[in-house]
A protein has these predicted regions:
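C-terminal peripheral helix-coil segments that are non-catalytic and often amphipathic
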Residues: 1-2, 94-98, 137, 141-149, ...
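Basic, helix-initiating cap at the start of DNA-binding domains
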Residues: 1-29, 33-42, 59
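Alpha-helical DNA-contacting segments of helix-turn-helix folds
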Residues: 61-68
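Short hydrophobic/aromatic patch on the recognition helix
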Residues: 44-54
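Amphipathic alpha-helical segments used for helix-helix packing
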Residues: 102-123
Length: 202
């Protein structure tokens, strides 16, 4: 086994601290309000040192999204091995709940959909693209199996179900209900899981 040098370990630890800071700032402020200066100050390093790891604000956001996708993929793989979630529908519901828990905890990065520079950077980021495809494929298998088993509406295109699940990661209803203070996190998650999978009709 190749031994990692102390310097390499320190650089890796600093990079992880930067990504963790970006993730939190994106969740709290959003991409437009987050600044490179704020990230550097939060980590406790000079901006010049930060640029040794990431060349732009867009690259910082990409690193945070890669970390978020890695976390989601790990959760999917965990659910796939959990006997308490026997059906694909059970697993999709569990993943939706987990996603909302992460958002309510302030750990889900929030990115704008209309920022052309950010979109171009993410499209060009192979690591991000590979993980997004991996997660989509894993969930796509569950969705198609669930439709074939009659547990999910077979008339809906699978991508509609997939994008609906992805939307739970940035659902504004979560923060609105939490800010209202009338419901616990558990109640909010349960209600939004019901509206996602059962709908609004009685």
């Amino acid at each position: 086994m190749t031994r990692v040098s102390f310097k390499a370990q320190m650089l890796r630890a600093r990079e992880e601290a930067i990504v963790a800071s970006v993730n939190r700032l994106l969740a709290e402020k959003g991409f437009d309000a987050m600044t490179v200066d704020a990230v550097a100050a939060d980590v406790g390093i000079a901006k010049a040192s930060l640029y040794k790891h990431f060349s732009s604000k867009e690259e910082l956001a990409g690193a945070a999204m890669i970390a978020a996708l890695d976390r989601a993929i790990a959760q999917v793989e965990l659910l796939a091995q959990d006997a308490s979630h026997a059906t694909e529908l059970d697993r999709l519901k569990a993943l939706a709940r987990w996603t909302m828990q992460v958002q309510l905890a302030g750990e889900m990065p929030s990115l704008p959909s209309q920022n052309s520079a950010l979109r171009a950077a993410l499209v060009a980021n192979k690591a991000y693209g590979d993980r997004l495809i991996r997660l989509s494929d894993l969930l796509g298998d569950w969705i198609i199996c669930g439709q074939h088993a009659g547990r999910l509406d077979p008339e809906l295109p699978p991508e509609v179900v997939l994008y609906t699940l992805f939307a739970k990661a940035c659902d504004p209803v979560l923060s609105l209900l939490k800010a209202g203070g009338s419901y616990s996190d558990e109640q909010i998650i349960e209600m939004l899981t019901r509206t996602c999978f059962t709908g609004l009709a009685r």
